[in-house]
Amino acid sequence: MDLSIFITVQGMERLQKRINELMAERPEVIKAVAVAREFGDLSENAEYKAAKERQRAIDSEIDYLRRRAAQLKV
C-alpha cells in the first residue's frame, strides 16, 4: 500500500528555503562553539553550552527536514 505524502510546489520551496537558511547559519554557530571553547573550562562555560545546544538543534532540524523532503511527493 502506497502511503505517499503530497506537498505543493510552494510547500517544497519553503522546506528547501528553511534547509538552506539552517545550512547558512551552521558555520556561524560552529565558529561560536570554537570561540566559546577558548574561554577555558567547558564544565562551567555557559556560552559553550548554549552554542553546542544551538548546533545540535540546527543539525537535528536539518536532518529532520531532509528526511521529510525525501518522503514527500510534489
What are these model-derived regions, one by one?
Residues 1-63:
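Helix-rich terminal scaffold detector
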Residues 68-74:
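Structured alpha/beta interaction-core segments
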